[in-house]
Regions:
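Bacterial N-terminal signal peptides that target proteins for export
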Residues: 1-10
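Mature, structured domains of secreted/extracytosolic soluble proteins
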Residues: 23-186
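C-terminal segment of classical bacterial N-terminal signal peptides
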Residues: 15-24
């Protein structure tokens, strides 16, 4: 009897942990904080100590409600270090109310209106001969490629970003942490 009960408990645990036979890796921590698949992009981003500049910019741009929405969204999320690498004074200037339109343009160049995991990006790039062009919510065109097993993103200004943490699943999409702010044509 005890053996049958143990088997039943083991089976129930196995099914709940593998979602009917398909197992998923746990979300990686980002900025020292756990990321919950049941929370939306904003609910998770505010917990990352590496994304305080991004969160402040999203708030200043009035994009919180959008990124809390249903989605799905893929967000290429630049770190604080990525913003700090911009020319001196750029972030402070962009956060001024009179520069909101430019801030919105830059931030929405980091958002794709679809859920694209890194495996999807790899497959699309391979199918397109090595580089896949994607349109962002902000009207930018990003060139996605894979180099040495890492997803690379070329922005319209010619800058290159590397995905440093991929596939952070959200309730409304996915975040890929990047090491460079993606810029539109200026």
């Amino acid at each position: 009897m005890k053996l049958a009960l143990l088997r039943g408990v083991a089976l129930a645990l196995a099914l709940s942990a593998t979602s009917f036979g398909v197992s998923y890796a746990a979300n990686p921590d980002v900025g020292g904080a756990p990321m919950s698949e049941s929370k939306n992009i904003i609910e998770n981003a505010v917990n990352s100590k590496d994304h305080t500049t991004l969160v402040a910019a999203v708030k200043a741009a009035g994009l919180v409600e959008t990124l809390e929405g249903k989605g799905p969204f893929t967000v290429f999320a630049p770190t604080n270090e990525a913003f700090a690498a911009l020319p001196a004074g750029t972030v402070d200037n962009l956060l001024k109310p009179e520069n909101k339109a430019m801030l919105v343009k830059i931030l929405t160049c980091h958002v794709v209106a679809a859920k694209a995991l890194s495996t999807d990006v790899v497959a699309m790039a391979k199918a397109d001969g090595g580089t896949h062009i994607v349109d962002t919510v902000g009207g930018c065109k990003l060139a996605l490629s894979v180099q040495d097993g890492k997803v690379m993103i070329k922005d319209e200004a010619g800058g290159m970003a590397t995905v440093t943490i991929a596939d952070v699943i959200q309730s409304n999409g996915v975040i890929h942490v990047v090491d460079h702010v993606l810029l539109p044509k200026m």
